[in-house]
């Protein structure tokens, strides 16, 4: 071969012009050459463009039917059959409405946001998260108790939209098709039946502030969060196609419903029913808009949440199923952790019942299951990584009740 002076025989990359001595490899094509550095650069460009295409196609490629949405929810959420059916239909109709708006149809379908009522730990947040994951849309959670109306110490309602924007990597189009779950919405109920002349900055005022973004408006969002100030530049976000799901335990609402139901049963023509103890979920299932207004939600706010899904209180059997049946069940999660240590973890049926019973005793629902298991397994999770030849760990009822230690099975064959 000749030298670097452009004489025949000396090969150069057809893209960057570097000579064969300046690169590690040159790949030959018909009358062209490409070096290893240009190949790496091309790979990066292709990967970046593929990512941009994926982002542009955010959202489901085909909107799942209500039955398909419910089937997906069944994989992660145990029980709550009626609530899952209501949510599946509501979410399907919402995104059909979004598609129709984009197609420019002249018939306007009004937005239907969702209100979920149910005891603590019954699965409200998990349902909302699972829906967003299934539909491949950005998702944000806000705590209503942190919100105050504009001008008071606390968080502006627009910061909820900022959380969604951040979840969408500041992609405006994606964010405007997302889902926002507002938790503890019962805590912003008005403190009395009649409007107060004093300011209720974390109650009725917040409901009023939420009204516009929930029904659909162009919100001015501070890009870095915090309070608004005149010198700041704002991001304009259209909330018309954002699905809002509000949730809360609504403790005390059952009394309002019972009171209303009781007045209807008075008089000679009243139907006499046999008295039986009703669960909180059964009572909440009879919720009417007027009950929510009496509880402390303003009529306009109730009107923006036309779809109401009530969740039942979880019993022991449901909690045991939650521990072992869903795709990401707690038992499977802990078994995976131990599997990484090459140890098989087994929970006896008695242990699972004991965990469920303790959660019921604490009145924490499914939310308290993890802390009970963590507490019971702290010592064994501390010791196992330092021990050799451990084959299996068995967690029984006594371990959960702090009355015994886990059974550890060693691999004798390995020590022989």
Curated annotation (Swiss-Prot):
User: What task does this protein carry out?
Assistant: ATP-dependent specificity component of the Clp protease. It directs the protease to specific substrates. Can perform chaperone functions in the absence of ClpP.
Q: Which NCBIfam families match?
A: clpX (TIGR00382), PRK05342.1 (NF003745)
Cited InterPro entries: AAA+_ATPase, ATP-dep_Clp_protease_ClpX, ATPase_AAA_core, Clp_ATPase_C, Clp_protease_ATP-bd_su_ClpX, ClpX_bact, P-loop_NTPase, Znf_CppX_C4
Claim: Nucleotide-binding is one of the keywords in the record? yes
Summarize where Zn(2+) binds, as residue positions.
Answer: 13, 16, 35, 38
Q: Name one GO biological process term.
A: cell division
The entry describes its oligomerization and partners as: Component of the ClpX-ClpP complex. Forms a hexameric ring that, in the presence of ATP, binds to fourteen ClpP subunits assembled into a disk-like structure with a central cavity, resembling the structure of eukaryotic proteasomes.
The answer to keyword Zinc applying to this record is: yes
Species in which this protein is naturally found: Syntrophotalea carbinolica (strain DSM 2380 / NBRC 103641 / GraBd1) (Pelobacter carbinolicus)
User: What family does this chain come from, according to its entry?
Assistant: Belongs to the ClpX chaperone family.
Which cellular component appears as one GO term in the record? HslUV protease complex
Query: Which residues of this UniProt protein bind ATP?
Result: 119-126
- By what name is this protein known? ATP-dependent Clp protease ATP-binding subunit ClpX
Keywords, A to Z, come to:
ATP-binding, Chaperone, Metal-binding, Nucleotide-binding, Zinc
Show where the ClpX-type ZB domain sits: 1-54
One Pfam assignment? AAA_2
GO: which molecular function terms?
Answer: ATP binding; ATP hydrolysis activity; ATP-dependent protein folding chaperone; protein dimerization activity; unfolded protein binding; zinc ion binding
């Amino acid at each position: 071969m000749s030298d670097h002076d452009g004489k025949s025989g000396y090969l150069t990359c057809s893209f960057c012009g570097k000579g064969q001595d300046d690169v590690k490899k040159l790949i030959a094509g018909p009358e062209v050459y490409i070096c290893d550095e240009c190949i790496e650069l091309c790979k990066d460009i292709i990967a970046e463009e593929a990512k941009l295409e994926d982002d542009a196609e955010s959202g489901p490629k085909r909107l799942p039917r209500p039955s398909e949405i419910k089937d997906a929810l069944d994989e992660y959420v145990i029980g709550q059959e009626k609530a899952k059916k209501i949510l599946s239909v509501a979410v399907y109709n919402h995104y059909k409405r979004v598609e129709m708006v984009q197609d420019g149809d002249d018939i306007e379908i009004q937005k239907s946001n969702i209100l979920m009522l149910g005891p603590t730990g019954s699965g409200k947040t998990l349902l909302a998260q699972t829906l967003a994951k299934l539909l491949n849309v950005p998702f944000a959670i806000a705590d209503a108790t942190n919100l105050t109306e504009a001008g008071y110490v606390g968080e502006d309602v627009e910061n909820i939209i900022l959380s969604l924007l951040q979840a969408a990597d500041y992609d405006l189009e994606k964010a405007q098709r997302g889902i926002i779950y507002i938790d503890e919405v019962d805590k912003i109920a008005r403190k009395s039946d009649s409007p107060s002349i004093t300011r209720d900055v974390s109650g009725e005022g917040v409901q009023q502030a939420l009204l516009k973004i929930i029904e659909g408006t162009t919100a001015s969002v501070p890009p870095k969060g915090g309070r608004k100030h005149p010198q700041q530049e704002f991001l304009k976000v259209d909330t018309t196609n954002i699905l809002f799901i509000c949730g809360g335990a609504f403790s005390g609402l059952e009394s309002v419903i019972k009171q209303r139901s009781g007045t209807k049963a008075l008089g000679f023509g009243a139907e006499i029913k046999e008295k039986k103890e009703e669960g909180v979920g059964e009572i909440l299932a009879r919720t009417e808009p007027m009950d929510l207004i009496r509880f402390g939600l303003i009529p306009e706010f109730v009107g923006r949440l036309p779809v109401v899904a009530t969740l039942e209180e979880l019993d022991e059997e449901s909690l045991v199923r939650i521990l072992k049946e869903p795709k990401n069940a707690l038992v499977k999660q802990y078994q995976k952790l131990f599997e990484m240590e090459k140890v098989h973890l087994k929970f006896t049926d008695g242990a699972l019942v004991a965990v469920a019973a303790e959660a019921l005793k604490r009145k924490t629902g499914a939310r308290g299951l993890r802390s009970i298991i963590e507490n019971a397994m702290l010592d064994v999770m501390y010791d196992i990584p330092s021990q050799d030849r451990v084959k299996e760990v068995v967690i029984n009822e006594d371990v959960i009740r702090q009355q015994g230690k886990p059974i550890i099975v060693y691999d004798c064959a390995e020590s022989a």
